[in-house]
Design a protein with these regions (language model features):
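Short, structured segments at the rim of ligand-binding sites
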Residues: 1-360
Length: 360
């Protein structure tokens, strides 16, 4: 493929698919509680695999690379009384740890076996009624482990109480899960490091069909923020809320503070517009803790590289245990476009900007 530098077309309007994070949570909630009609569902492979798994009658579920599906479905199948399920995935998925979640579920009374290596998929899950309610879990682990438990909490006979030990990673994703539980009628509390989910009561839950329109995906929006920052042209994005459930909506602040891209919301049209400030003075460097929004760090680093802004980004420990080691992958790809970097277990720092490689 031959790429030639060109000018960005201004004032274009883009429709982005629904948030993967919201969609995957909704698919579980709809299956557990019913009466939810989902609009603007994510077209991501993760969400498609989640839908397929929830509809499957097979004893074996293969979720390929879909980490969210692996985690959410592990808890879901653990409470499907009388049903035995084997959940597996790609070779990379079999290298991604799941022990913290399995240990927590076993503490609650779930019956789960490792079929190959302890602490890793594939899993054999024998669904049963769970009556225990209290569990402790390290707070620094992936928020998806914790959200997985929260989503089933309302279906447990005595509810669920989780004590999070240590500093919480990706807190906005936990808050998203709890807000969504509230929206569908599941009562919950989050005080300091303790989360409580109260047992589902029919009177609290919506009795008629609930229409839930999924707002578009802020992680996907990051690419268009990057285009606006580099190309300095306006871009309109549809189906975004001013007050978003998604932690990655912090994009608005990051791209304004460091790259001069202003976000204007139009609630009447359910749209946001990205306006690059042409007189913006770019900072001499950027330092940012992205512990609460690690998934957009790659886009931020690419944007900073294109604009030749030295950067130091921390809070990225979870990127090393994704479908690939995203920190190593990011370092390799940035080198191709002229940015030498230094990485640690949870950070990346730019060292030098040079010319991009001729052939990438």
């Amino acid at each position: 493929m031959f790429l030639e530098k060109s000018k960005l077309k201004g004032n274009q309007t883009i429709q982005i698919s629904g948030s993967k994070s919201i969609s995957n949570r909704l698919l579980i909630l709809e299956k557990l509680f019913g009466n939810i009609l989902i609009e603007n569902l994510s077209n991501s492979q993760d969400s498609q695999l989640m839908q397929k798994a929830l509809a499957s009658k097979s004893e074996t579920i293969d979720i390929h690379h879909a980490g969210t599906a692996m985690r959410f479905l592990t808890s879901y199948f653990a409470i499907q009384e009388g049903k035995t399920t084997i959940i597996t995935g790609s070779e990379r998925m079999k290298q991604r740890p799941i022990q913290f979640l399995v240990d927590a579920l076993k503490t609650l009374g779930a019956e789960i076996e490792y079929l190959e290596n302890d602490g890793f998929p594939p899993l054999k899950i024998t669904g049963k009624k769970i009556t225990e309610k209290f569990v402790q879990i390290p707070a620094h682990i992936s928020s998806q482990f914790i959200s997985s438990l929260l989503l089933i909490g309302g279906k447990l006979e005595n509810g669920l109480e989780i004590e999070l030990i240590g500093e919480i990673t990706s807190r906005p994703y936990l808050e998203m899960t709890l807000k969504m539980l509230s929206e569908v009628g599941i009562q919950n509390e989050f005080h300091e490091n303790t989360v409580k989910i109260f047992p589902y009561k029919k009177d609290d839950f919506h009795s008629s069909l609930m229409n839930y329109k999924v707002e578009s995906d802020w992680s996907s929006a990051s690419y268009f923020y990057s285009l606006a920052a580099i190309g300095r042209e306006n871009i309109n994005l549809k189906s975004f809320r001013t007050f978003s459930l998604q932690g990655d909506s912090i994009l608005r602040e990051i791209y304004w503070n460091f790259f001069g891209v202003n976000t204007i919301s139009d609630e009447s049209d359910y749209q946001i517009s990205l306006y690059p400030e042409h007189t913006f003075q770019f900072p001499e460097k950027m330092e940012l803790d992205m512990n609460n929004c690690p998934d957009i760090a790659q886009t931020v680093c690419v944007t900073a590289t294109a604009l030749k802004i030295p950067f130091y980004i921390t809070g990225l420990a979870t990127l090393k245990v994704k479908e690939t080691d995203r920190l190593v992958a990011l370092q390799n790809e940035l080198k191709k476009i002229g940015c030498e970097t230094e990485i640690t277990e949870n950070s990346i720092r730019s060292l030098e900007f040079t010319e991009a490689e001729e052939n990438i």
